[in-house]
């Protein structure tokens, strides 16, 4: 398969661009990772998991009396913004603190750890029980509502976001000869 772009390897060209433009790369990574993962979360019932329709849940929280369309559009906007903000936080703060090794595998591991452990736990421990289902007593990750499948789905969703984020936000080492 020919993956050449302008005489350079397309994957390497992307990594050079990411390294030279960390903020722009984080924004793009957040947009793309967020959209892909959000679609997969909505399609989770296809593999026997509960749907994670974060845009609808977010929109219903923002405007509980709005129509389905208003809730979805508002939720998609704010959920998409969340995905971008968390990608920026990852790229600018967490990524540099998680070690100096910047191989594709290590970059992927960093993103998966960040998204699954930190973001997944925030979602399961706080957002789902105290924001999206406030007052229903559903417990950690909705364990009293959807059982283990809902908790698993929350962590699976965040792992998928991390995989997408790590695949896209994949810089080179700052001393890489390609950067000169």
Locate each region found by the language model.
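Juxtamembrane/disordered regions of integral membrane proteins
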Residues: 2-180
């Amino acid at each position: 398969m020919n993956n050449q772009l302008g005489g350079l390897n397309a994957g390497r060209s992307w990594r050079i661009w990411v390294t030279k433009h960390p903020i722009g790369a984080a924004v793009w990574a957040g947009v793309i990772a967020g959209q892909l993962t959000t679609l997969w979360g909505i399609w989770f019932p296809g593999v026997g998991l509960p749907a994670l329709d974060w845009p609808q849940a977010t929109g219903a929280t923002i405007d509980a009396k709005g129509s389905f369309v208003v809730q979805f559009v508002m939720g998609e906007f704010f959920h998409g913004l969340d995905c971008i903000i968390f990608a920026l936080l990852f790229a600018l703060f967490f990524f540099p603190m998680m070690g100096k090794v910047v191989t594709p595998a290590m970059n992927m591991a960093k993103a998966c750890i960040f998204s699954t452990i930190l973001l997944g736990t925030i979602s399961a421990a706080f957002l789902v029980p105290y924001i999206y289902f406030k007052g229903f007593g559903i417990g950690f990750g909705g364990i009293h509502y959807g059982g283990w499948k809902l908790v698993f789905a929350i962590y699976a969703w965040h792992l998928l976001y991390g995989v997408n984020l790590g695949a896209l936000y994949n810089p080179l080492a700052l001393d890489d000869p390609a950067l000169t």
